[in-house]
């Protein structure tokens, strides 16, 4: 009799737990830099993008309300891991979004895998997320170091820049960005003549720029991001480097231009998968975003990636019927084609890489610009299958043998 009662109690407890899970909100955690060098590039803007996606989807998935949380990882992997564990263990978070700073993204991806939830990296850059460190619980949405490094190195080489000096952020993202650009450079017959590593949030690039200047390289490649891009390009102009050497920022975004000005940044090449002024759909969404943004800025590609990633995630949650099993949700995301107003049609590969076209853009001159945020012109389109690393070259364990 006691054993029967115990079994019934266990069944009742399991049923109660299942009911509670079914009634609890689907929670989206946006984790990024809210207070340092990447805050203007993801920060509150990525949180807004996630909220807009939830609103546009209708506010519910699998019959459950959808909520958005956010946290500042301070660009520290240990802080990111602590936040992720608290979110997943105590706060009922089902998916973690954005993750600029690849070292943080690696740490969070591992926690998410252990807890069988979902991570969608939009701000994260390292292509290792879909390479040796791929996971059945992780999707890499917007860009990666392979796409930026290879595309820009090829474009610059075609314009005559054959000898390079790298100024590289000294963490996983910077190292990988330099490696990918170097790979394309060497394949195209170019040469690396030197390089230096810089800490994140560097305020004085003078010693690094002097080393680049004395190297005699035709191209000074900045493998840094966020506020470090703005600071290094400003100081390069002050040192007069652009008069004798080409300054190439391997990750140069729309948010860098206001701080530099069009006069200082005109002619700079960059690669984006999204630009607000591409078509009527991107313009309409971007204007809505700008009206609500804390800094009244137009969205960048990584913030757009948060929006699109949340939409596709919620579709998968509806398809699966819940958010509890992260692997099942990611499998559904891969099985369904992607389609949204910002990136258009695409798909998610077996290794977790989201595929879409990339665009080679150039910063306009002051005379070409028609006003605020009219900063770029599209030079060419890179088809999706060429924009990202071939599947069989990534060494992702999920696709071993392919």
What are these regions (language model features)?
Residues 235-308, 318-320, 324, 367, ...:
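Extracellular/periplasmic periplasmic-binding protein-like sensory domains
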Residues 25, 40-46, 56, 60-132, ...:
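Beta-alpha junction/loop-to-helix N-cap segments that form part of ligand/metal-binding clefts
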Residues 14-19:
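N-terminal signal peptide c-region/cleavage motif recognized by signal peptidases
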